[in-house]
Amino acid sequence: MRSSARISIHQMTALMEKMPSYGDYRSDEQAAEAERTFRRALGVMLKECGDHLLNVADQRSQALNAEEEGKVDALIDRIGMIFRRLDREGDVCLVGNCDNTIHELEEIDLRLILVIEKATEMVRNLESGTQTNHWFQTEAERLSRDLSSFSEMTEERNYLLGLGWESEFSWPGRESL
């Protein structure tokens, strides 16, 4: 694997610097702003993944078959679902025991960063000399699973932060915290 296919240290550092420091929140406004900042940073990286997929699909449009084009569309749809979940606004109100919830949020945030790093690497591999049909047979399915996992973790964060819509109802498998 080429090093150019990896996420840059600058990108990773910038994302990690935007991770919320939940224990340091002193006001609702501070919590909401920290959330917006982190969510935007995740969204920027997801947008880059989506843009890269679309650019490669456009550049290789004649080489892609209908199934491969369908996979690109499905991946873009998954990214769109994540955007909707990242776009949740509202008052941050941690559910359950604050210490336990903060610990869970920190774990989820780290997993989100690892997934976005892996997703970025997979998307960039599509252009880095990997044969297109091989990428669509192996990497596209892995990327789809990773994006699905990312989406679920995003919704779990929403629940833990008390941020609306699906989160207004109990998170599956969580009767109480």
Protein language model annotation of sequence segments:
Residues 1-61:
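Leu/Val/Ala/Ile-rich N-terminal alpha-helices, chiefly Sec-type signal peptides and the beginnings
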